[in-house]
Amino acid sequence: MAERTARLLLLTVTVGLAWGSQGDREPVYRDCVLRCEERNCSGDALKHFRSLQPIYMSLAGWTCRDDCKYECMWITVGLYLQEGHRVPQFHGKWPFSRFLFIQEPASAVASLLNGLASLVMLCRYRASVPASSPMYHTCMAFAWVSLNAWFWSTVFHTRDTDLTEKMDYFCASAVILHSIYLCCVRTVGLQHPSVARAFGATLLLMLLLHTSYLSLVRFDYSYNMMANVAIGLVNLAWWLAWCLRNHRRLPHTRKCVAVVLLLQGLSLLELLDFPPLFWVLDAHAIWHISTIPVHVLFFRFLEDDSLYLLKESEAKFKLD
């Protein structure tokens, strides 16, 4: 549904980390980066660096300065551990061991698997649900929006840049808003299509204004987090209220209830925020992995509900 919603509800207090963390504020780290850049990132030294850099690293956008930050991060971590201190974060993130050009291997793979699950369920939905089902096109659009979000999540965890960060955040917001629209169509729009169209246009305008402000005015992490928390609460509450009201008449709504409750429960994994195991697997990656079956379950609900609506519409047509 909106896998990131539950996580957003728990991360509000950590927004400040995006602006700086203990590790990157350390004089040892700053001095190390400065010396590394002076030594390696200009003139003949830079040419030498580029000649030795693997092609996949340069294609992924890894620069000499990025490599300096990466190497100095591990030097700083080593000093912390040597002195018996807790592993620090850098730029709002734990230190991760890079694999090839992938910055956060476990989260990137987990995002990719979520995307593949979305693709498989999209194909399954299209194969099992006729296009004449009242919710077919809305559900298909939601599947594509979800697939796009997981693509950018994979890219972001592969290579964290300003662009990939924004696309990850914006596409996550789009998924939540489209889930709200999906719920609106299911609960109101089938009886009042004009209401759903007007509501959908409003949500689209909200997304446009949200992304425009963050892109053109100021990327405010706190505002972005609070905005997503607000729409996430609306999304979860609306789906849960509708499911509980209709669970006796529509047994398949239990799958949707399970999705909402599981997402809330699994989001507690984020509270376990700990340095990555083997410098690869952190709580966020585990959370991403755990959402794969939940994602599949929600698409199963959409499939069951669409087939129910098709059967209901065909029965009404025969009566008419």
Swiss-Prot record:
The keyword Membrane applies. The gene is PGAP3. Keywords: Glycoprotein, Golgi apparatus, GPI-anchor biosynthesis, Hydrolase, Membrane, Signal, Transmembrane, Transmembrane helix. Involved in the fatty acid remodeling steps of GPI-anchor maturation where the unsaturated acyl chain at sn-2 of inositol phosphate is replaced by a saturated stearoyl chain. May catalyze the first step of the fatty acid remodeling, by removing the unsaturated acyl chain at sn-2 of inositol phosphate, generating a lyso-GPI intermediate. The fatty acid remodeling steps is critical for the integration of GPI-APs into lipid rafts. Glycans are attached at residue 40. The keyword RNA-binding does not apply. It comes from Cricetulus griseus (Chinese hamster). One of its GO terms (cellular component) is endoplasmic reticulum membrane. Residues 120-135, 191-198, 245-258, 304-320 are cytoplasmic. It holds the Pfam family Per1. One of its GO terms (biological process) is GPI anchor biosynthetic process. Belongs to the PGAP3 family. It is a multi-pass membrane protein. PANTHER family: PER1-RELATED, POST-GPI ATTACHMENT TO PROTEINS FACTOR 3. GO terms for molecular function: hydrolase activity, acting on ester bonds. Residues 21-98, 157-169, 220-223, 280-282 are lumenal. This is GPI-specific phospholipase A2-like PGAP3. Residues 1-20 form the signal peptide. The chain crosses the membrane at residues 99-119, 136-156, 170-190, 199-219, 224-244, 259-279, 283-303. It is found in: Golgi apparatus membrane. Its EC number is 3.1.1.-. Its main location: Golgi. InterPro entries: Per1-like (IPR007217).
